[in-house]
Design a protein with these regions (language model features):
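Domain-level signal for soluble alpha/beta catalytic cores
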Residues: 1-201
């Protein structure tokens, strides 16, 4: 894994945006969490759309036509889903960029998305570029994954990059939320990413 040159002193960075203010989804999660923590007996809380967060995964299409994926997202929104999470090359398969589908869902459905960020396919430079682009384009919810090995897909001899693993990307995003890149350099503003990973990332 790449270990960027570290500055001699730990950079101070900016104060991160509070979790509840990063996205609409993070605001709802924060409210639900506080209600559960403060409840005398959280097991007796009635599950309603207001106190339960719903995220459903929709995969990008394997070709050029995103219609079925967008219609699936539309149906899920009408059914009460809060957010659509969009996979990044699941099972090491070739599909449309999840960044593209995320933008279509945002534009056509005005629905928040969670973008999967996979360590497998991008080096340290590409990961940073794609994350900064996603932020500028309004995608602030991330699920960080290491990624399935290429041998599971149609191109078993494809090169897996893995400059960073999922934990390394989480650390990088944490730095971005303080306005600092992996080399410790400030870039003038802080991102407001809400990031998550799997229990076995």
């Amino acid at each position: 894994l790449v270990q960027p040159d570290r500055p001699s002193a730990e950079p101070v960075g900016l104060e991160p945006v509070p979790f509840a203010e990063r996205t609409r989804f993070s605001k709802k999660i924060d409210r639900i969490w506080r209600e559960r923590v403060q409840a005398p007996d959280s097991s007796k809380i009635k599950i309603t759309p207001d106190n339960f967060a719903v995220s459903v995964e929709v995969n990008p299409p394997p070709g050029l036509d995103p219609t079925s994926a967008i219609e699936a997202a539309r149906m899920l929104k009408e059914g009460g889903a809060d957010v659509i999470n969009i996979a990044d090359g699941p099972r090491a398969s070739v599909r449309m960029s999840n960044q593209a589908l995320a933008q279509l869902v945002l534009r056509e459905l005005d629905m928040e998305v969670i973008l999967h960020v996979c360590a497998r396919d991008r080096n340290l430079l590409g990961l940073q570029s794609d994350l900064l682009a996603a932020h500028v384009l309004g995608v602030h919810n991330l699920v960080i994954i290491t990624g399935d090995p290429p041998k599971l897909g149609d191109y078993p001899h494809a090169t897996a990059v893995f400059d960073l693993d999922s934990i390394g990307i989480l650390r990088m995003v944490k730095g971005f939320n303080r306005g600092i890149d992996p080399a410790g350099k400030a870039f003038g503003a802080a991102t407001r990413f809400m990031s998550a990973c799997g229990a076995e990332p």
